[in-house]
A protein has these predicted regions:
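Short beta-strand edge/turn micro-motifs at domain boundaries
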Residues: 1-12, 107, 111, 133-175
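Short, low-complexity N-terminal intrinsically disordered segments enriched in polar/charged residues
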Residues: 2-55, 59
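Alpha-helical membrane-targeting segments
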Residues: 30, 175-176
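Residue-level preference for long, well-ordered alpha-helices that form the structural scaffold
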Residues: 30, 34, 73, 131-132
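Alpha-helical packing segments of well-folded alpha/beta enzyme cores
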Residues: 37, 41, 80, 138-140
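A solvent-exposed, acidic/Ser-Thr-rich amphipathic alpha-helical stretch
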Residues: 44, 49-120
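Short, solvent-exposed secondary-structure boundary motifs
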Residues: 86, 130-134
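Short, surface-exposed loop/helix-turn segments at secondary-structure junctions
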Residues: 122-131
Length: 176
């Protein structure tokens, strides 16, 4: 892709804070408990508190991750989040926007937009460390449901980020 776009100097640069344009919306979400709960859970995961997965996820949670990955349960969540964090062990994770919804006849829902910014310093989902400065813009949506015990747990999760943009940042670093 980089070569097809004219090489490292001419190619389309991936989105980073350096080329960001401030839009008209600057809100950070709402005060709903479900958005706060999802944001808190993601912050804990990114602080390597992976035990939160077994506490917050339903054992049969359906999980959709980048690359067309469809997986289930604690193991699937562990594998995805640990792989991402392992690639960028010292990167700074920030919640940028969190919203939750409680509506009649609907399950509780939440959406979080987040960023991960730092160097590719670890072995994980993005292979051998390169030292590349990487910026990941991600979004996680979740649906919660009650168990027999009545304690609501995360039962569906959809997390997205642009894998191609992450790889492009890594490859551009290698070509410099």
């Amino acid at each position: 892709m980089i070569a097809r776009e004219g090489g490292p100097d001419a190619c389309v640069k991936p989105y980073t804070p350096a080329n960001d344009v401030t839009g008209p919306y600057t809100g950070t979400g709402n005060e709903n408990v479900w958005g706060k709960r999802l944001a808190s859970m993601l912050e804990k995961i990114m602080q390597a508190e992976f035990d939160v997965i077994s506490q917050e996820y339903n054992r049969a949670a359906q999980l959709e991750y980048p690359g067309g990955v469809n997986t289930w349960s604690f193991e699937g969540a562990d594998q995805f989040w640990m792989g991402l964090r392992a690639s960028f062990p010292n990167a700074i994770f920030k919640v940028r926007h969190a919203i939750g919804r409680d509506d009649p006849a609907m399950p509780p829902r939440a959406a979080v937009r987040w960023t991960l910014s730092g160097r590719h310093e670890g072995y994980g989902a993005f292979g051998e460390p390169t030292g590349a400065e990487v910026f990941v813009l991600g979004a996680t949506h979740a649906e919660y449901g009650e168990l027999i015990s009545g304690a609501p747990k995360l039962r569906r999760e959809w997390t997205l980020y642009d894998e191609t943009a992450v790889w492009k940042q890594i490859l551009l670093h290698k070509e410099i």
